[in-house]
A protein has these predicted regions:
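Long, C-terminal-biased catalytic regions of enzyme "large/alpha" subunits
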Residues: 1-167
């Protein structure tokens, strides 16, 4: 879920009963960390599928720009929001071959312009920003999913929830 900060802004947290429940279900600390990371985020492009430090470097990004992307990923809810002139600077975008007309257009996607597919962007987004759900988490056994069901579907792709008659 998202926690609103008193000074403005939001950050992602997981219900504090989740780590305890995972422990009680017999998951190791390492397994629990992987499950929680799936839901919340890795907050870095390091190791992300498709859009990662190596692929970004191959596309022409320099180390400092990749560091800026990682720093912006710490608070991002979608990776598309960090790939812009404000994070990277116009010099970077021009060096990569893009024009002010392109990167000043709010409809324009740098990730798509770099050749990434919607599926690749979605996979990287899930890794970097988290899925906001436990469904599909690595190592989480299917039979344990009901333990984590709640009143609403979680995340953009969540399907499970407790029906109103179950409350």
């Amino acid at each position: 879920k998202f926690k609103k900060l008193s000074g403005g802004g939001y950050f992602k947290i997981i219900n504090q009963s989740v780590p305890a429940a995972l422990k009680n279900l017999g998951y190791s600390e390492k397994e629990s960390e992987a499950i929680i990371k799936y839901a919340t985020d890795s907050a870095s492009f390091a190791g992300a599928p498709f859009i990662n430090h190596q692929s970004l470097s191959e596309k022409g990004f320099i180390a400092d720009e990749i560091k800026r992307l990682d720093a912006a990923a710490l608070t991002a809810f979608e990776i598309g929001f960090v790939f812009n002139k404000y994070t990277l600077g116009e010099e970077c975008l021009q060096r990569l071959g893009f024009t002010p007309e392109q990167y000043n257009d709010f409809e324009w996607s740098l990730l798509e312009a770099l050749g990434y597919t919607d599926e690749q962007i979605e996979a990287a987004n899930d890794y970097v920003c988290g899925t906001m759900m436990l469904e599909g988490a690595p190592l989480l056994k299917e039979e344990h999913l009901p333990v984590f069901d709640c009143a609403n579907k979680c995340g953009a792709k969540g399907q499970r929830y407790i029906h109103a008659h179950g409350h």
